[in-house]
Amino acid sequence: MAHFPQTPGFSGTLRPLRIEGDILDIEIEGEVPPQLNGTFHRVHPDAQFPPRFEDDQFFNGDGMVSLFRFHDGKIDFRQRYAQTDKWKVERKAGKSLFGAYRNPLTDDASVQGMIRGTANTNVMVHAGKLYAMKEDSPCLIMDPLTLETEGYTNFDGKLQSQTFCAHPKIDPVTGNLCAFAYGAKGLMTLDMAYIEISPTGKLLKEIPFQNPYYCMMHDFGVTEDYAVFAVMPLLSSWDRLEQRLPFFGFDTTLPCYLGILPRNGDARDLRWFKTGNCFVGHVMNAFNDGTKVHIDMPVSRNNSFPFFDVHGAPFDPVAGQGFLTRWTVDMASNGDSFEKTERLFDRPDEFPRIDERYATRAYRHGWMLILDTEKPYEAPGGAFYALTNTLGHIDLATGKSSSWWAGPRCAIQEPCFIPRSPDAPEGDGYVIALVDDHVANYSDLAIFDAQHVDQGPIARAKLPVRIRQGLHGNWADASRLAVAA
């Protein structure tokens, strides 16, 4: 008989759902723009069985992939588990066999040495396939329409790295998928690699290099000429695993680094720039103006996770709030200092997104989730530590911003931009995001006019179920699905 822990990561608004299914023609409130023809894929952690340990955490769940298929003013829905090696062997056993988050020392003996990946962090269509990703394991390939799992890939045996990041970027000019790996030669190793995959899914390059210290490298930036790696001291070690401590611990005594690697260079061309201790979040975008390299992302004074502190200090939710910030370094300089640090937005924010047609280049428009602690929250159980209750838009050319609050009983999941047409100007289009009603226990996929989010949704696809809090997802126009059709 299944019994999930009554802990914050497995109860209330984060209670596991474990639902697979299909819905044709979801009920719509308003009108879906009829020209939208494509897919929105997103993923959330959702353990298929109760964890081996009561103190397990949210990020350790099996990947559950959701597909919203837009066509003819309608939206269809499909949801399936990413059938990783872990998922399959536990399905056969009828119970969890893998232990604590990223700790192989806690696994059942029967699965020692197996790939522990859950494919629960991000999904993206590339080369006609759906890439399901988690940064501690290889990339999992799925069919973007049926959501059937094909299996892990090492790109025809050519990729040497054992892991594949969860936040690749597609260069809009070349069509290449730009990615990286950390722990590339095994858990706790300093080995990293910068990776590019062709539009047809072939490995083009894998540039190995070393990290200053082993840490969580969740996201990165890519410009026209450079790969940009923000390194923060969210650390791990075998000692931590042997003591059954949480996998990561944030060390407030160590500096942060920004690594700049020419995309057409090698490890000898890599430069590290240094700054003071801080916590960095997801990357909005990066670009370079000659030798000057810029990366935009939320930056906070201290650890943003309430359960990761190497010194045991209590979580400080104020110091942990991130604000969209631009770091600038100059590859023509002789030193290792930042040229400039500039805050771009004065409200605490996360999950930043852009018009992906402007990825790797100078850009103007951005969207993000805002943590508005001044707004009330009236759902049972109280808010979890980072309630993303507001959707924001910023125009970096004018500095103007607008926002929409979801209401006192709702949270918003990561937004995603869709161009109005392939040749529409930057930022002209729609933003979609799941809005979770924590009282009614339903989720709506809300559609906004991208530059007028303050006016609220122009349409809602009303699901008859709640979709568990997710991590990341992406839009793919129908033309990118042609190979898979």
From Swiss-Prot:
One of its GO terms (biological process) is carotene catabolic process. GO terms for molecular function: carotenoid dioxygenase activity; iron ion binding; lignostilbene alpha beta-dioxygenase activity. Activity is high with beta-1 type stilbene and minimal with beta-5 type stilbene. A 4-hydroxyl group and trans-stilbene structure is essential for the binding of substrates to the enzyme. Inhibited by N-benzylideneaniline-hydroxy and -methoxy derivatives and N-(4-hydroxybenzyl)-3-methoxyaniline but not N-benzylideneaniline. Fluorinated olefin (Z)-1-fluoro-1(4-hydroxyphenyl)-2-phenylethylene is also a potent inhibitor. Imine linkage instead of ethylene bridge in the substrate enhances the inhibitory activity. It comes from the Bacteria. Fe cation binds at residues 167, 218, 282, 472. This is Lignostilbene-alpha,beta-dioxygenase isozyme I. Catalyzes the cleavage of the interphenyl double bond (C alpha-C beta) of lignin-derived polyphenolic diaryl-propane type compounds (Stilbene).
